[in-house]
Regions:
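Hydrophobic or amphipathic alpha-helical targeting/insertion segments
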Residues: 13-16, 21-44
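Conserved phosphate/anionic-ligand binding catalytic regions in large, soluble enzymes, centered on
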Residues: 18-23, 99-116, 428-448
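Catalytic or ion-translocation cores adjacent to nucleophile or general acid/base/metal-coordination motifs
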Residues: 36-54, 114-159, 455, 464
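An acidic, phosphate/nucleotide-engaging active-site surface
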Residues: 53-104
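A conserved active-site cap/scaffold subdomain adjacent to cofactor or substrate pockets
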Residues: 131-238, 255
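Short, Gly/Pro- and small/polar-rich lid/capping loops
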Residues: 201, 205-228, 397-427
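C-terminal non-catalytic interaction/assembly regions of soluble proteins
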Residues: 233-420, 434, 443-450, 455, ...
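Helix-rich interaction surfaces within compact, conserved domain-sized segments
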Residues: 476-539
């Protein structure tokens, strides 16, 4: 901020950021010190109340269950953080009180944008459609250049990445907005880039739950109105929920691993042989020193298409990177494996190589425990110039999913002569994580392609495609592991896949612990379409 503060003051730009992390007060105070050093007159406000770590004993005693798995609250001495996801109204209140810069701790990412909208347009808590649109604008903006050509299926169209432009949303009082990027910057803004970001990291698109509103994105429309200009309309809102999502992190075991490369004939077979030897030697040492076996092991051969499972198409692999990793209750168990990885370095099949510095070290497995906290339980405040302003919240209402009117399922096409084409010719895709779940959003390139995609990609087909990442037996219970949602406004389907990330995030020892590449795996699917469509997309 320091290099930009003078220009911020000169132009009267107001800044809202959730950069406060676990200590927003310290961040705000540091900003004030820099502002004073520069002799500027800027007011900094700080949103407080998300941090609940001081209440961990009471929370543990309350008996909260993990909101997805039903697990009990972790041991108190293992808990590192407890933070509630706050909403946008405290941000708006700070702006209304004259703050030039608003710093928050944990809040939903879209709240920084929605808070600015509430302040600018005077939206109230009952303006649900506007709140949903403002939240969608925030959702589009929150991952920066992922809305302007980053992580984009048609990546060849996104150029000058070293100077990629960050997204801009010009929002109107009714909530509709136009996405763009600064002139002269790289990347692009198109219906495709905005659609992909809209489906990123969402679950049920008709019940995208935020503290201030439950959003329905299923009828959103995207219209290209000029070069790098996309108009967004159509999100609607339901009443705010009656609880906050609270995330606690806690230490649970240890993890560690390393990567090494093989090249030459049968590189995949050589890597598998070495991995087996490392595990055998490590387990022998574990037994000698009286330690239990590893609680989880992972070997991934990046280059031999291990991420594709039964759909792998590489034969006679000649070059790959092997990632080997484990979990153990004792860091010494991790150290044993890391030592064996080095010790067996001269005993391997030929072609081993690698680029690395110091030997990796064991690190804690940090797991996430999420639970629903009834509204009214938090003391939310704004601190500005040493004054504390209370921001009481309304209690909200319980979401009744069974009352949501769902789009009509698409009828399967009846073409007699079907031709198989890869999904990537018919659709765009974007995937991401939701804890130990992953979502994969599929956006048809043309509306007429969607019925064919919908017919081919049912819950069973998706479970089978990701079977190597799912718990054993999941393909026999596909409806328990895969949810499928239609989004007619953008001719899209969103899939939510449960228990597919090996714990997700820091709890996982997968190479892709956040499902970032799952969309690419889906785009490889073969979809039967009419001969006319096949001719069109293959032209």
């Amino acid at each position: 901020m320091k290099p930009n503060l003078k220009e911020i003051a000169r132009q009267g730009v107001r800044i809202v950021s959730n950069a406060g992390g676990v200590n927003p007060q310290a961040c705000a105070n540091a900003l004030r010190a820099v502002i004073a050093e520069l002799g500027l007159n800027l007011k900094v406000a700080c949103v407080l109340g998300d941090d609940m770590i001081s209440q961990r004993d009471q929370i543990a005693g309350h008996g909260y269950k993990e909101m997805f798995s039903g697990e009990d609250f972790p041991a108190v001495d293992k808990v590192a953080s407890i933070n509630a996801y706050l909403g946008a109204f405290p941000v708006a209140r700070a702006l209304q009180k004259g703050a030039d810069i608003v710093v928050t701790g944990r809040c939903v990412d879209s709240a920084v944008t929605l808070g600015a909208c509430i302040n600018a347009f005077g939206w109230g808590r009952d303006d649900l459609d506007q709140l949903a649109m403002g939240s969608l604008a925030g959702h589009i903006l929150e991952c920066g250049p992922q809305a302007t050509g980053g992580n984009f299926t048609d990546w060849e169209l996104s150029n000058n990445l070293e100077n990629i432009g960050y997204p801009i949303a010009a929002i109107k009082p009714d909530g509709s907005f136009v996405c763009s990027k600064p002139e002269g910057t790289g990347g692009l803004v198109s219906v495709g880039t905005i659609a992909e970001q809209m489906v990123y990291e969402i679950g049920d698109p008709q019940a995208y739950i935020l503290p201030d509103v439950v959003c329905d994105f299923s009828k959103v429309t995207l219209t290209e109105i000029g070069e790098n200009l996309v108009e967004v309309k159509g999100a609607t809102g339901l009443a705010a929920p009656d609880s906050y999502k609270v995330c606690s992190t806690y230490a649970d075991q240890f993890r560690g691993g390393t990567t090494m490369s093989f090249y030459g004939f049968d590189a995949d077979k050589k890597a598998k042989k070495l991995a087996a030897a490392i595990f055998t030697a490590s387990r022998r040492t574990l037994k000698m020193v009286g330690l239990p076996d590893y609680t989880e092991t992972s070997v991934e051969l990046i280059g031999a298409e291990s991420q594709y499972g039964v759909n792998a198409a590489v034969a006679n692999c000649r070059e790959l990177s092997m990632k080997i990793a484990v979990k153990h209750s004792d860091p010494a168990g991790i150290g044993i494996l890391l030592k064996e990885c080095v010790g067996l370095g001269l005993a391997t099949p030929p072609g081993l190589s690698g680029f690395a510095g110091a030997r990796p070290k064991p690190s804690p497995v940090v797991r996430l425990f999420s639970f629903a906290l009834p509204k009214g339980s938090l003391k939310i405040q704004i601190e500005m110039d040493g004054t504390y302003i209370d921001c009481p919240d309304t209690l909200g209402a319980a979401l009744k999913r069974e009352l949501i009117e769902r789009p009509q399922a698409l009828s399967a096409p009846l073409d007699s002569n079907m031709v198989h084409v890869p999904l990537i010719k018919l659709a765009l895709a974007r995937s991401g994580d939701k804890g130990n779940k992953a979502n994969v959003g599929i956006i048809a390139r043309q509306p007429e392609f969607l019925p064919y995609i919908y017919a081919a990609l049912n819950e069973q087909a998706v479970a089978e495609r990701f079977a190597h990442f799912l718990p054993e037996g999941a393909t026999q219970q596909s409806l328990s592991y895969v949810e499928r949602y239609l989004m007619p406004g953008t001719h899209a389907i969103n899939f939510l896949i449960h228990d597919v990330l090996g714990g997700g995030g820091m709890a996982s020892i997968r190479n892709d612990a956040q499902g970032k590449g799952f969309g690419q795996l889906m785009l490889d699917a073969s979809i039967p379409v009419s001969a006319a469509i096949a001719a069109e997309v293959n032209a």
